[in-house]
Amino acid sequence: MKTGKPDNPKNPESLLFPPILPPTKPVPQTGDDPYIFLYGGLLAAALIGGSVFAVYYFKKGKYSRTSLKRTAVGVSVLSLCVLVALGSGFLVFRDLNQYAESKDAYRDLAGYVEVPEQTASPESAPDPTEPKRDDTDIVLPSVDFETLRENGPDIIGWLSLPDTVLNYPVTQTDNNEYYLNHLYDGTYNKVGCLFADYENQADFSDRNTIIYGHNMRDGSMFALLNRYDEQSYFDAHRQMYLVTPKGGYVMEIFAAFAAKPEESGSETSPWQLSWKDDGAYTTWLTAMKERSAVESDVTVTCSDKVLTLSTCTPGGTGRFLVMGKLVKVDNEI
């Protein structure tokens, strides 16, 4: 509630009492590390440059007093090239090794998760007034959460997109930074892990639950989300599956679009977590659907719960989001 005249630019009190704006929470940086290309470029430049200098200065075999200074320069440059090659080579190896380690780590979870080989989508969208449905043609992944949590105690769910590499655990901790560079078991790794916003409820009961994940160049994690700006890809992948310790859900995708992290904190932010009433939530849902880069026949109302998947756009400056409503699947997991 505004009091006095703090908003009047002619009032000197406005300098002392500026308008109070809602806090803006930073959106996690979920792009892949761009420096592997720099490391690779330095390695190539060092190897090529070193080879050129080696041939130019030592092939002639001139080591007289008059050429001593020139030879010293050549040795110095060659030594620098060797050092750069060793350093950049190590960094390239480190990054590639982390890719391999992450793949091995997630492959180790295969024994705790049984993903059906064949899945089918329902022929038509469900009645939006019906919170549950009995879909005998939908077979969710079977997840042994008890054993899974022995390896990753912060795991709260499992997200999968049939017939793709997107098949990962979802974690959550008390911040949005830790799992940007740690695997589900706490191992440091730049690939990180999918994780829910720390302000969300762990049971996915909020109106909007956000899951963040990296856009990795090797195609892992949330890399394929950026393909949802293509209508053909969306048409072939309209649903994802979310399994939790308390049940399973179908994520029926209704919107996919790019956004700027600066939008966080605004009324139309896709990362919004709370609304003052049903009307505000309905307005937000409509705005999200209107922003979509693809056409979807999925309807959303104020009674629906939304799952928002957030990753970086290529280049890392923007964000790409895929949004869907969660529909409880009323069958055995």
Write out the residue ranges for each language-model feature.
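Solvent-exposed, non-transmembrane regions of membrane-associated and secreted proteins
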Residues: 85-333
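Gram-positive cell-envelope targeting signals
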Residues: 1-129, 312, 332
